[in-house]
Amino acid sequence: MAEKFEAFVSLGLANGRYKDFYDIYVLADRYNLDGMELKNAILETFSHRETGFDDIAAFEDEFTEDVTRQRRWRAFIKKKKALLKVEFEDTIQLLKVLLIPIVDAIYKDESFEKSWNKETKNWM
């Protein structure tokens, strides 16, 4: 998950790797996650690849509202015959709920001793 997150951050607005977004969505939908474990993995991956958290283009409105990107997302979902037929905006929204609190904890150099609950789709 950390590598997929780093990939879509480093690619910025040029990102066309819809599988990364989808895979993270599926993991958040299907599994409970340990916050500290995920935070440490993200921190290690971003540090190793020298990627910053300053600009996460995928979390900007212009990224999710782009009509071409939405069309490509629907084509990806159709071609993949995805089990979870989710809209692009809903996918990005879940990724924000999942990942922004971890990024905030990294910025503040704080621990993140929470658990992701797959049922509520939130940190507890």
Q: What does each model-identified segment do?
A:
Residues 1-124:
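Structured mid-to-C-terminal alpha-helical surface segments
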